[in-house]
């Protein structure tokens, strides 16, 4: 049963909402420059905190894995990425939130932030309209960063690959280790895959996926590691492309195109990685699944 929060407390449009790992907290962000934290219990919800610090619309919020603590990242039109942490205080006062890191090296809107799989550490990728991607990492009690050019006309989205290689779980041969890799979508209509080189400690493009004829608004890497790699990309050209790569030929990516009646804003995989949710400018959400023949079929429409 869906729970609807009708009175969000925000004074303007809400751009993103995200639940924590346990599904007990909900963070929302808005053009009113604030972030709201709700506590969820059964069918009820309670506003427990309003976080203020951004100087522009807040586009994105993302919870870190709980093994790093109660940490939330936010990104804004103001060009900043803020890292927030909840700290327990005296029993009588409960807990309090504080800003633990400000990252302000981007020169334009930061459109999306995405945490890496927790196996890779406390690592955050940030996509900006200045054409750059930054990667922040918390190690040894301090934050470090890398920033590099990614797309000529701006970066709209970023999504991490699973830490394990596809097929490694069911393979008879041992895995070669964890992979640090992500995908970006840009205003240059391109989807790019970035690989980390542990020797040079830098990221470089390993694949450029072409096919969209409009801005790529969102990308999402499937969390499934059972067989193949799947990346979904959503575009202003009214299509979603599902890019597939097989472990037997990891350098080849093929795509399947889904067509829609409106601009497509967001794509999101289920936790198991086998169902794709698509939302667009027509205020509809549809769910898609691959059949046994390798074709993608719509299994449900969700309309308010």
From Swiss-Prot:
One Gene Ontology molecular-function label: structural molecule activity
GO cellular component: COPII vesicle coat; endoplasmic reticulum membrane; nuclear pore outer ring
Subcellular location: Cytoplasmic vesicle, COPII-coated vesicle membrane; Endoplasmic reticulum membrane; Nucleus, Nuclear pore complex
SUPFAM superfamilies named among the record's database cross-references: WD40 repeat-like
Predominant place of localization: membrane
GO biological process, one term: positive regulation of TOR signaling
Topology in the lipid bilayer: Peripheral membrane protein
Nucleus found in the keyword field: yes
WD repeat residue numbers: 9-48, 53-94, 105-146, 150-204, 211-253, 259-298
Keywords, sorted A to Z: Cytoplasmic vesicle, Endoplasmic reticulum, ER-Golgi transport, Membrane, mRNA transport, Nuclear pore complex, Nucleus, Protein transport, Repeat, Translocation, Transport, WD repeat
Pfam families in UniProt: WD40
InterPro entries in the record: G-protein_beta_WD-40_rep (IPR020472), Sec13/Seh1_fam (IPR037363), WD40/YVTN_repeat-like_dom_sf (IPR015943), WD40_repeat_dom_sf (IPR036322), WD40_rpt (IPR001680)
Stated role: Component of the coat protein complex II (COPII) which promotes the formation of transport vesicles from the endoplasmic reticulum (ER). The coat has two main functions, the physical deformation of the endoplasmic reticulum membrane into vesicles and the selection of cargo molecules. It also functions as a component of the nuclear pore complex (NPC). NPC components, collectively referred to as nucleoporins (NUPs), can play the role of both NPC structural components and of docking or interaction partners for transiently associated nuclear transport factors.
Family statement: Belongs to the WD repeat SEC13 family.
Subunit structure and binding partners: The COPII coat is composed of at least 5 proteins: the SEC23/24 complex, the SEC13/31 complex, and the protein SAR1. Component of the nuclear pore complex (NPC). NPC constitutes the exclusive means of nucleocytoplasmic transport. NPCs allow the passive diffusion of ions and small molecules and the active, nuclear transport receptor-mediated bidirectional transport of macromolecules such as proteins, RNAs, ribonucleoparticles (RNPs), and ribosomal subunits across the nuclear envelope. Due to its 8-fold rotational symmetry, all subunits are present with 8 copies or multiples thereof.
Protein name: Protein transport protein SEC13
Organism: Coccidioides immitis (strain RS) (Valley fever fungus)
Protein's gene: SEC13
